[in-house]
């Protein structure tokens, strides 16, 4: 992680964790050491070959990680390897953008797909089951898991769904102004987000939440001894984004993640809007950008 920090001091904490994890997993998969930039450069051909099996959407992030890691190496091969990685990454970005414009589900997303109505039905059934539990003074381990799932889904469904990181870093107590937390100001409850993927660009975000969600969080604070909103399966530490995803997979019995939930939410909300590719093609034919085209639309 030190190399990433030294090479890119402005990298967010989330990106540092992601890049460090990518490098460790890559070394494990290739069964080689990738502890230094020079070792990455040494094994660059093996890495490139290995990454051919990775979808462009994921590969571009792995390549960005590798470029940051080796970019200040004194090796004579650094420039050539960076050029190779960057060319592949730019092709992946182009291909990914093309796929995004098509607005088609990946095979993995198709496996996890549910309608918003189906998701809300599961949530409603869970709510009925845990309502008596939320009134208890203390929970068993199993009861805790059920209630925690209810809290998580409440956060994802009662307001527009955010990424996993936003809630794995959310604190119930012992927080500072720089933490993700709930704030009640002039009797109005808010979620405050400081740690999230695009925080460097947008800064602190304040999301007004419904009273129902605020009540759920207050009740949960009394039942959950941890300072964090969500605990891992052993209830010994805060949950990680990967563990949160696994919780959702287990509950819905399919690969439904926060990412897919965001797709489902937006697809339902904007279901009457024309396809993105069609809108871009029309804007191009009219000689202006998509942004300008949207400004022309009057409702």
Report the location of each language-model feature:
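Basic, Lys/Arg- and aromatic-enriched nucleic-acid-binding interface segment
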Residues: 116-164
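Conserved tyrosine-mediated DNA breakage-rejoining catalytic core shared by Y-recombinases
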Residues: 131-137, 169-211
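A short, glycine-centered helix-capping/turn motif at helix boundaries
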Residues: 145-146, 155-174, 272-276, 286-288
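Non-catalytic DNA-binding core/recognition domains of DNA-processing enzymes
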Residues: 4-93, 260-263, 287
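Solenoid-like repeat scaffolds
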Residues: 9, 52-53, 140, 173-184, ...
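Active-site/catalytic core of tyrosine-dependent DNA strand-transfer enzymes
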Residues: 206-265, 270
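Flexible interdomain linker/hinge and immediately adjacent N-terminus
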Residues: 79-136
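Short, polar N-cap/turn motifs at the start of nucleic acid-interacting alpha helices
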Residues: 254-255, 275-298
């Amino acid at each position: 992680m030190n190399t990433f920090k030294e090479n890119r001091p402005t990298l967010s904490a989330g990106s540092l964790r992601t890049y460090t994890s990518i490098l460790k997993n890559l070394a494990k998969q290739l069964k080689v050491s990738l502890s230094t930039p020079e070792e990455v450069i040494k094994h660059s051909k093996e890495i490139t070959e290995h990454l051919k099996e990775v979808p462009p959407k994921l590969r571009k992030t792995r390549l960005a990680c590798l470029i940051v890691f080796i970019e200040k190496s004194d090796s004579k091969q650094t420039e050539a390897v960076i050029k190779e990685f960057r060319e592949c990454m730019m092709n992946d970005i182009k291909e990914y953008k093309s796929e995004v414009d098509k607005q088609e589900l990946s095979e993995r997303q198709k496996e996890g797909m549910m309608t918003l109505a189906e998701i809300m039905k599961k949530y409603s059934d869970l709510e009925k089951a845990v309502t008596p539990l939320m009134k208890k003074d203390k929970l068993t381990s199993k009861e805790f898991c059920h209630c925690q799932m209810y809290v998580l889904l409440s956060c994802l469904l009662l307001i527009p769904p955010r990424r996993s990181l936003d809630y794995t870093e959310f604190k119930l107590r012992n927080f500072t102004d720089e933490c993700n937390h709930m704030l009640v100001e002039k009797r109005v409850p808010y979620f405050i987000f400081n740690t999230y993927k695009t925080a460097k660009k947008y800064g602190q975000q304040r999301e007004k939440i419904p009273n129902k969600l605020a009540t759920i969080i207050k009740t949960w604070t009394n039942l959950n001894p941890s300072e964090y909103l969500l605990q891992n399966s052993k209830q010994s530490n805060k949950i990680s984004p990967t563990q949160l995803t696994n919780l959702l997979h287990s509950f819905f019995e399919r690969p439904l993640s926060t990412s897919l939930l965001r797709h489902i939410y937006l697809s339902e909300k904007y279901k009457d809007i024309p396809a993105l590719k069609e809108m871009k093609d029309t804007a191009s034919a009219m000689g202006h950008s998509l942004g300008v085209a949207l400004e022309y639309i009057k409702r």
